[in-house]
Amino acid sequence: MNEGEVVLTPEQIQTLRGYASRGDTYGGWRYLANLGDRYADDAAAIVGKDANLNGLNLWMKKGVENLWDDTVGKKTRLEKFDRVALQHFRQYARLINQNNGRLPNTSEIERSYYKAVTDNGVSSSAAIDLVINRSLPDMADGYWALGLGIEAERIHNEQAVNNPNGSERDNRKQLISALDKGFDGSFKEKHFTFLQSVMMDVTKLGVEYTIDGWQKIGGWGNGIINDLYKSVVKREWTGIFEIVNNNIKQGNEAFKNEINSLVHDMKAAGKEFGDDLNTQWNNLTQAAEIIYNDIVDNTSQGIEKGVKAIKELSEKMKNAASDLADGSAEKAKQVVEDLAQAAKEAYENAKSTAEKAAQAAREFFKGLPSFKDLAEKFRDLFPNPEGWIDDGHQCLAPWVKETKKRNGKYHVYDPLALDLDGDGIETVATKGFAGSLFDHTNNGIRTATGWVSADDGLLVRDLNGNGIIDNGAELFGDNTKLADGSFAKHGYAALAELDSNGDNIINAADAAFQTLRVWQDLNQDGISQANELRTLEELGIQSLDLAYKDVNKNLGNGNTLAQQGSYTKTDGTTAKMGDLLLAADNLHSRFKDKVELTAEQAKAANLAGIGRLRDLREAAALSGDLANMLKAYSAAETKEAQLALLDNLIHKWAETDSNWGKKSPMRLSTDWTQTANEGIALTPSQVAQLKKNALVSLSDKAKAAIDAARDRIAVLDAYTGQDSNTLYYMSEEDALNIVKVTNDTYDHLAKNIYQNLLFQTRLQPYLNQISFKMENDTFTLDFSGLVQAFNHVKETNPQKAFVDLAEMLAYGELRSWYEGRRLMTDYVEEAKKAGKFEDYQKVLGQETVALLAKTSGTQADDILQNVGFGHNKNVSLYGNDGNDTLIGGAGNDYLEGGSGSDTYVFGEGFGQDTVYNYDYATGRKDIIRFTDGITADMLTFTREGNHLLIKAKDGSGQVTVQSYFQNDGSGAYRIDEIHFDNGKVLDVATVKELVQQSTDGSDRLYAYQSGNTLNGGLGDDYLYGADGDDLLNGDAGNDSIYSGNGNDTLDGGEGNDALYGYNGNDALNGGEGNDHLNGEDGNDTLIGGAGNDYLEGGSGSDTYVFGKGFGQDTVYNYDYATGRKDIIRFTDGITADMLTFTREGNHLLIKAKDGSGQVTVQYYFQNDGSGAYRIDEIHFDNGKVLDVATVKELVQQSTDGSDRLYAYQSGNTLNGGLGDDYLYGADGDDLLNGDAGNDSIYSGNGNDTLDGGEGNDALYGYNGNDALNGGEGNDHLNGEDGNDTLIGGAGNDYLEGGSGSDTYVFGKGFGQDAVYNYDYATGRKDIIRFTDGITADMLTFTREGNHLLIKAKDGSGQVTVQSYFQNDGSGAYRIDEIHFDNGKVLDVATVKELVQQSTDGSDRLYAYQSGNTLNGGLGDDYLYGADGDDLLNGDAGNDSIYSGNGNDTLNGGEGNDALYGYNGNDALNGGEGNDHLNGEDGNDTLIGGAGNDYLEGGSGSDTYVFGKGFGQDAVYNYDYATGRKDIIRFTDGITADMLTFTREGNHLLIKAKDGSGQVTVQSYFQNDGSGAYRIDEIHFDNGKVLDVATVKELVQQSTDGSDRLYAYQSGSTLNGGLGDDYLYGADGDDLLNGDAGNDSIYSGNGNDTLDGGEGNDALYGYNGNDALNGGEGNDHLNGEDGNDTLIGGAGNDYLEGGSGSDTYVFGEGFGQDTVYNYHVDKNSDTMHFKGFKAADVHFIRSGSDLVLSASEQDNVRISGFFYGENHRVDTFVFDDAAISNPDFAKYINAGNNLVQSMSVFGSNTAATGGNVDANIQSVQQPLLVTPSA
């Protein structure tokens, strides 16, 4: 925030918004003025509330009120003034809110006021508009701001934002600054202020005398003075004001200074201009001086004459007004005519002289903007050598911060300061080069420093007597050297040495007192001037007190007051003196001495000095190593070469640091020690933490990283002016972070140095090719030589040309060099085609590529076009300032021209592009230009919202001009002209006409503010009205029509249309179709027309019109306004007796009796017809009118049909009559009789009586104590709130009492009724009352679930009380008492006893929570336990018994019973029969008893008990809990040897050997018996116990029968023994022996061995590398997956290897075997013949099989061998040879010739004439290959 800047708080903003919303313009401005806004102070005066209005404010107010030239009459002008003022104030408040409380700047205020003026219909020649846009062109923001009283500070603040580097290139802001400071010595006083007063006088005449004086001489006089004012005073004043200011602007010496500044900067930057160019510069500057002098002379003369003429005119007008007041009409007329002539002559005289000056200025300065732009562009080709320091500061800041944090001290400076103005010692922050620089440490380098403010001073002593304070040694602080050679601890210690008499005071008694000075640095530059050094006597200082206190007070700005004392003045008063710790910024530094450079040295590349380093040129002049390295770097021709030298260059510059090599090596430490002269040390907590971590050691990796960074740390110290002797860390992570910050900072530094030297080194030869040329009488830069230079380099080194051009465009600010961008595009395309693009991009680096992928303009006139970088063809172009040309190219592009006259170019294939053209400036001319043969007839022009859409008719592209039609195309977003390739031009007016033309499709048509007729035509169209009175015709199609602010007519026509009226008194006609009409504001007329329409009138007095065939229409008439009168009007002869009036809910339904239509008036009856939705009157074609009261009576009349009748709030009797009726009560006490039919009756809030009558009725009591009588039929009664009486009557009724104490009444023949009595309230008493002689002994009481069933013993009826027993009868559903006709009463406790009594039938008995014994007796009973410990006896029958939460005992007794234990430790005994027992949770005991039982223990440690005759039982023992122990217990003398234990799958089978029973433990062996289904122990009656391990052993023992034996996961050996056995392997390596019998053996996942033994066996290998041996018999072997070995053994075997590399082994006597070797893998299979030589085996083809025959008895058939490789065996191995598949393949592939011949492999030739392979020739016996029989 700038000092003194006003910023509103959120609360103040809210208060301001309140003024805006109330329209209190004056109050709002005054509120802002009181907060310090000086613009608001003047604005408050201008809006006319302040009494003392004078001067400039009067001029502004009267000008705004009276100078409109398009309005007549004072009242109209004042109203318009008020509207302008209010809109401007509201926009001003909105800007403050958007700016987070900051006041708007001048540009924002200008735009706000301009918009307020134009939005309220004021033409561009209005007074304020003149001030902004005519009188002061190009300077409107500055002069206008001053004119309206904006303080100079805010103008300056805006300059600082717009020119952060202090650039003076914007001439408008130069003139503002010059004006504010008093341009031309006393410009404001001499010219501007004076001219304001003259203008005020003229205005005053036009106002006061027009109103007062001229009225006395009649209407003709008033007309003449108006004509005089408009034709002479106003127009001519405007002209001279414009000329004067234009000449002032063009004659401003700043133009000349700017030229000289540019030339100086260019030369200073090291650019060598030739003699010709220097001559041109000199000629131009000389011409400028000559013409400038002429301009000044002529302009001054013009100003003087103009001012004189205006003053004379003003005096004459005053005199004329006086004469006219009392003179005759004839005399008055003559005076006015003379006055007009005199004014004209005076003006012409002044104008002639002024125009001569203007013409001279225009002639010279016509070319100056382009020439100035030329110089700026050339200078912008290279960075400013000084400018890199700001970048360097940013990149080095992290290192400075890190060293401050790690080295235990902060660099501060420590001088004594005095408070000279009594407000405390004040300091300022470091400000880089813009602030104070001082040599504190006496090393010859001035560095940026915190400083004492100008109103306080530093205590100093000029030790060397040169009149200047040279360095910190001449201050009093820690750089003061004491007599003993040490440095002072602080300022007070330094001053104490001057206390020669030891009295602890420095005064005249001390010898050095007279040598002391106070330095008051008035200009804050850190350099002492003579007028800034004052003696103590001059300042009235008598003595300096050496006593002080340590305060360590934070002064802000990075500065601290460390010690504070005082000094005494000669008047006896005291003031503060303190020792400061000033912030240090060593980056911004300047050496006090300059190095004189030779001409050659001055040509070297340069960067400004930084830290402890001189300017690069100066440093190189002092260092031969650096000079040589800089020369080598400058001569390097490629980026790679420069980067290879960059590190060395950076180091060589760093080595010129005066401290280089003089300080001790940097070390890292966790042990901090306080030392003197260390500045501000670590905090105590940081010290404590360091001491805690003193033992932290670093890993070798961390140490290596730190060692590698040491050199870079030294470099960074030189560049930053830091000293990193010791860096502290608290952990290894801290240490590694130091390395990271070091490397990151160094890399950023290297990047900045590279970029800032680029144009002074490698790219300089290209810049030398840029020349100048004259075009249209002005200088421009000529880049043609530059293009040639790049192409020349490209011929020999394409990569260099590519990289150099890319970096020139990226860093040279040459985006306006169109040829260069086009050249880059060509280079990119060529690189892509050559496959080099990615390589080139890697050389460039990500940052450069990103800059080229982004396209953004400058303040100049740029040509912007994507050059092919980036991954997306869709680009965004930003023109910013200047007259820019934006070319998007292919892809979907975003183009934003910014300010200036911009041109958007679109050629063939332009894509889906968007143009954002916001530019509020006047005089700009923005153009869209279509090229490549595109003409207007190839495009369509449509509008969508405020956007203009230009679409190619062939669908190839679209340009969207955003907000084009804002302000009807006159706003800031417009495109002024659209140009086509055939020369045709469309202006805004033509475009506006085009977009209002309809098509046969779906159009969007918009009216303009003046009012239009729009016709949608065919298609589903959108029509939008504006502020005029529009006629909007939708025509055919489903149209959407939106009115504007006028009185519009909307006609939907055919189709289902939507019409919206908005403001104004609109007429809406839906036409045909189902339409939606909404009148919104105004007194509207809505005609739905044919179809089913929805009509909303909105606010205002609306009329809904319905004629014949109006359809099924709906009216929504919400309008809460008072005084409105809404009407429904029936036309076309429709009368009231042709309609019916009924009510449905709050809706009124008006139906045609002939069924032709209906009007539903929604919510008509809200508030009994007095609400916001009512229709006030219904009018008919015969003149009859129905008001609301009449309608209310009509809708309560019943018919013989199904009626809906509603009571009103006062209470009514409604009779439904015949039909199924709906009756609704209200707030009164209503009597609602349903009568005949199935009626629905709803009570209201009163005590109502509801009588259903005949039929199945529904009665709802709602609030109140209601009486509900269902009558005949099956009725539903709901009492809801209140103490209600419910009588179901005849039929099967459902009764709900609701809340309150309710009574249910049942008499004879009450039917099958249900009571739902939910009511949780305390204190209620609900009763069932039996009448008509019914007593308790005539009824039975039973329970079903939680329901109570009360049944008539004669079967005539039943009452079910739902959920009665919830919470054991104490819940919300209970009936508190049951009353009988004999006076007997049953309470809840009695009822609970009754329902637990059993019968001989099938009972449902329920225990209560306290615990019960229930006996089912005879019948199939259901017994239910509860939370107590229950005894539940099923007794006889098939019973279902359910335990509760207690420890319950369940006895099934006789029959097939189901027992469920639920929670608790339960005992379940099934008894006789086939029972199902489920213990569920708890440690349960389950006894199945006799019969075949199914037992589930559930969770917990359960025991299953089996005695004699236990039957065929099954145990399901799933329980995954840890710690449980489940047991099977055999009783009745049963021991283990009486049983067998076998396994079937995962089940354990325990069988009685005598066949009397079996227990199947399901899934016992899951996870090898460790799973959730296991039984932990089996107990026998003799005490023996079997654990799981024992059982597992038992089931693996074989018998002489057919066994099923299973291996375990760890690996097992299984022996089948006798019998046909099934053996199953598992995941381990198993040995499975089938032994005798026809066995089936299944391997598992391990490497298993399967031996079939005797018999015809089946062996299956599964996964793993298995060995299968069939043994004797005809066996089937299948290896499946893995590398298996298959041995068929004796017999005729079938062998399948499966996948993997399998081996088939055949020995002597192997029989007639078949091998099926199909596989899809690439493994190798082998057939091994043991005991056979190759000559013993014949190879025979048999169809597709290969037969290997050793004898008639022994042969192997390889099935499908000749089908292909997937069926073959790869290698045949014999005792003496091996034949591989490749050896054999050529003979297989030889085909029939080989098959039909005999080849002797041992001979040298064969029938085919070919030779055989050597390994096959080694076979001595012929191998026959013959066709099969």
From Swiss-Prot:
PANTHER family: S-LAYER PROTEIN. Belongs to the RTX prokaryotic toxin (TC 1.C.11) family. This is Iron-regulated protein FrpC. The Gly-rich region is probably involved in binding calcium, which is required for target cell-binding or cytolytic activity. GO terms for cellular component: cell outer membrane; extracellular region. Hemolysin-type calcium-binding repeats lie at residues 869-886, 887-904, 1015-1032, 1033-1050, 1051-1068, 1069-1086, 1087-1104, 1215-1232, 1233-1250, 1251-1268, 1269-1286, 1287-1304, 1415-1432, 1433-1450, 1451-1468, 1469-1486, 1487-1504, 1615-1632, 1633-1650, 1651-1668, 1669-1686, 1687-1704. Keywords: Calcium, Cell outer membrane, Membrane, Repeat, Secreted, Toxin, Virulence. PROSITE patterns: HEMOLYSIN_CALCIUM (PS00330). It is found in: Cell outer membrane; Secreted. Residues 1671-1690 are annotated as: Disordered. GO terms for molecular function: calcium ion binding; toxin activity. It comes from Neisseria meningitidis serogroup B (strain ATCC BAA-335 / MC58). It is a peripheral membrane protein. May participate in the pathogenesis of meningococcal disease.
